[in-house]
Amino acid sequence: MESVLSKYEDQITIFTDYLEEYPDTDELVWILGKQHLLKTEKSKLLSDISARLWFTYRRKFSPIGGTGPSSDAGWGCMLRCGQMMLAQALICRHLGRDWSWEKQKEQPKEYQRILQCFLDRKDCCYSIHQMAQMGVGEGKSIGEWFGPNTVAQVLKKLALFDEWNSLAVYVSMDNTVVIEDIKKMCRVLPLSADTAGDRPPDSLTASNQSKGTSAYCSAWKPLLLIVPLRLGINQINPVYVDAFKECFKMPQSLGALGGKPNNAYYFIGFLGDELIFLDPHTTQTFVDTEENGTVNDQTFHCLQSPQRMNILNLDPSVALGFFCKEEKDFDNWCSLVQKEILKENLRMFELVQKHPSHWPPFVPPAKPEVTTTGAEFIDSTEQLEEFDLEEDFEILSV
């Protein structure tokens, strides 16, 4: 009983220290599209931050590829940040942005299933094993440090094998987001006997839409949108600061990947000119499923004070993330970008309606033909030959 009380008191101390570290100010804190008034809502702020899934270095997992490393300490921080961004997208997809986590409280089955996607086992679809081995197809050796764009490309390819979450992952190119390409990728016909074939001709679709019918009404595949950027040469250009902060205010925000060379962080919000981030640079022991099939999640939530960094100390190479569960969410995001991002004289990125004529034709990514199922698809790097090697756009200097 004393040990239980001691543990509880220690937790109270952590929370108190956390709350006292934030200044008594009237400024708003923005966390992934939600605002908190620091002076009166510190406990809500704590609850919101601690609800984010926190992935860190792990040790004592099965060797990657059978003979590779059994810990990602020292090299896996950007992969862990990518996991955190994707996990937030899955939380929004299945549980909603307003879902909250409480320690030792029974959680929805969807939460447990999301968590199991990221366990450090080769049969988990977004495990460190799968990400590291998929990185080989992006020119990265297992155990080599990744940049944000490489992680984005890896997530895009792994998502093709993830039928349960069924995400469309779009990674922008040349600082440009193309609306036409995203809608082509995300609009899918309902799976039925009548609509399982090819998409109807444009003329027929337009005709039905004009009549207000739903005979060929398309469904929307939830979108994970990642925008890799370079916001300066050696340091972030101050002209981008306001636009960068605006992205954390958008309801579609998944935060940003970035940090400093060889030190990746997952940025989830800001207070004034300070960015708030979750730090993966803590090495914890591998956690597996228990006998009842659940995962002990106590080490997957950060109950200590998240760190802060002045935005001007951020390395200029970053990747923004956004989640659009429905088409209306994407349309709203486009409106916000046009209002808040494109108004700047020096734009952080471009949003265009049509596919640029000088680009290669856009082909929505498709699952390669490999004779495996689900998350078990990569057992060796030989299978990576099914993927085309994309140009490596490393955006954090090593």
Swiss-Prot record:
The LIR motif (LC3-interacting region) is required for the interaction with the ATG8 family proteins. Required for proteolytic activation and delipidation of ATG8 proteins. GO terms for molecular function: cysteine-type endopeptidase activity; cysteine-type peptidase activity; protein-phosphatidylethanolamide deconjugating activity. Its EC number is 3.4.22.-. GO terms for cellular component: cytoplasm. InterPro entries: ATG4_LIR (IPR046793), Papain-like_cys_pep_sf (IPR038765), Peptidase_C54 (IPR005078), Peptidase_C54_cat (IPR046792). This is Cysteine protease ATG4A. Belongs to the peptidase C54 family. One of its GO terms (biological process) is mitophagy. The keyword Hydrolase applies. Keywords: Autophagy, Cytoplasm, Hydrolase, Lipid metabolism, Protease, Protein transport, Thiol protease, Transport, Ubl conjugation pathway. It is found in: Cytoplasm. Inhibited by N-ethylmaleimide. Redox-regulated during autophagy since reducing conditions activate ATG4A whereas an oxidizing environment such as the presence of H(2)O(2) inhibits its activity. A motif (LIR) lies at residues 393-396. The keyword Membrane does not apply. It holds the Pfam family ATG4_LIR. The active site is at C77, D279, H281. Interacts with ATG9A; the interaction is direct. It catalyses: [protein]-C-terminal L-amino acid-glycyl-phosphatidylethanolamide + H2O = [protein]-C-terminal L-amino acid-glycine + a 1,2-diacyl-sn-glycero-3-phosphoethanolamine. Cysteine protease that plays a key role in autophagy by mediating both proteolytic activation and delipidation of ATG8 family proteins. The protease activity is required for proteolytic activation of ATG8 family proteins: cleaves the C-terminal amino acid of ATG8 proteins to reveal a C-terminal glycine. Exposure of the glycine at the C-terminus is essential for ATG8 proteins conjugation to phosphatidylethanolamine (PE) and insertion to membranes, which is necessary for autophagy. Preferred substrate is GABARAPL2 followed by MAP1LC3A and GABARAP.
